[in-house]
Amino acid sequence: MDSNTVSSFQDILMRMSKMQLGSSSEDLNGMITQFESLKLYRDSLGEAVMRIGDLHSLQSRNGKWREQLSQKFEEIRWLIEEVRHRLKITENSFEQITFMQALQLLLEVEQEIRTFSFQLI
């Protein structure tokens, strides 16, 4: 994973954790948790691609990795929709910038996971 993506994740997570969105703070905490989970999943796929010989152990260790992959894409789509919704309803420029960057990062991560998964198939 390149260092720009790592710092982007860290920056967005830090800024999202500082936001106070009133009654929706539970939703925001859920988004933060999913962002962190997504980052870990993307990292593990990237590591598996780096050790392409690891493909067989990945498949035997987890016969349902394609199902997990599908689930992660569903989570990404949900996060994208949630971030777009937040972007539409917020008037705070700090939040708008944060959510725009989060959206961009989600789209990049989705593409990276697709690339990794095609290399593993």
From Swiss-Prot:
A motif (Nuclear export signal) lies at residues 12-21, 85-94. InterPro entries: Flu_NS2. Keywords: Host nucleus, Host-virus interaction, Transport, Virion. Its main location: virion. GO terms for biological process: exit of virus from host cell nucleus through nuclear pore. One of its GO terms (cellular component) is host cell nucleus. It holds the Pfam family Flu_NS2. It is found in: Virion; Host nucleus. Mediates the nuclear export of encapsidated genomic RNAs (ribonucleoproteins, RNPs). Acts as an adapter between viral RNPs complexes and the nuclear export machinery of the cell. Possesses no intrinsic RNA-binding activity, but includes a C-terminal M1-binding domain. This domain is believed to allow recognition of RNPs bound to the protein M1. Average number present in a viral particle is estimated to be 130-200 molecules. Belongs to the influenza viruses NEP family. Interacts with protein M1. May interact with host nucleoporin RAB/HRB and exportin XPO1/CRM1. This is Nuclear export protein. It comes from Influenza A virus (strain A/Chicken/Brescia/1902 H7N7). The lineage of its organism: Viruses, Riboviria, Orthornavirae, Negarnaviricota, Polyploviricotina. The gene is NS.
